[in-house]
Amino acid sequence: MDTIGHHYIVEAAGCDPKVIGDADKIREIFLEAAKRGNMEVKASYFFKFSPMGVSGVVIVAESHISVHTWPEKGYAALDVYTCGEKADPEKAVDYILEQFKAQYAHVSEIKRGIEEDDETFTHTILTWEEKLDRRNGKL
């Protein structure tokens, strides 16, 4: 079966609270992540909660990139879903984690699709965790 889409669900911890608490900064990061992931941006919306936290989404022709943040915990929940052949969601995820200065990431990749003429849904789930080494600004 051909995969219709790649859905990355990311738990990011140890993030810089100043970055993940700034809706404008996150928008900037997501727009660049979409570019690096070879995605075509269609729209974006970000909302800053009071007193803290951000939720936002970038709609791309290939699907979406979304986030919910808890700066007080240094935590961000990311969702990157793409379909088609040209997008590279992993590049987008890597860039976002780097910009958030995440110290730890748990990533699940779900390969999504449906069998042609069968209406049988197929999901393949790959999961990995990594402690991110960010000494001297290098991953």
From Swiss-Prot:
Reaction equations catalysed: S-adenosyl-L-methionine + H(+) = S-adenosyl 3-(methylsulfanyl)propylamine + CO2
PTM (free text): Is synthesized initially as an inactive proenzyme. Formation of the active enzyme involves a self-maturation process in which the active site pyruvoyl group is generated from an internal serine residue via an autocatalytic post-translational modification. Two non-identical subunits are generated from the proenzyme in this reaction, and the pyruvate is formed at the N-terminus of the alpha chain, which is derived from the carboxyl end of the proenzyme.
Note accompanying the cofactor annotation: Binds 1 pyruvoyl group covalently per subunit.
InterPro entries: AdoMetDC_C, AdoMetDC_fam_prok, AdoMetDC_N, S-AdoMet_deCO2ase_core, S-AdoMet_deCOase_pro-enz
Cofactors demanded by this protein: pyruvate
Pfam families: AdoMet_dc (PF02675)
Keywords from the UniProt entry: Autocatalytic cleavage, Decarboxylase, Lyase, Polyamine biosynthesis, Pyruvate, S-adenosyl-L-methionine, Schiff base, Spermidine biosynthesis, Zymogen
Active site: 63, 68, 83
Record EC number: 4.1.1.50
Modified residues (Pyruvic acid (Ser)): 63
PANTHER family, A to Z: S-ADENOSYLMETHIONINE DECARBOXYLASE PROENZYME
Family listed: Belongs to the prokaryotic AdoMetDC family. Type 1 subfamily.
Function per UniProt: Catalyzes the decarboxylation of S-adenosylmethionine to S-adenosylmethioninamine (dcAdoMet), the propylamine donor required for the synthesis of the polyamines spermine and spermidine from the diamine putrescine.
Name this polypeptide is given: S-adenosylmethionine decarboxylase proenzyme
Species annotation: Pyrococcus abyssi (strain GE5 / Orsay)
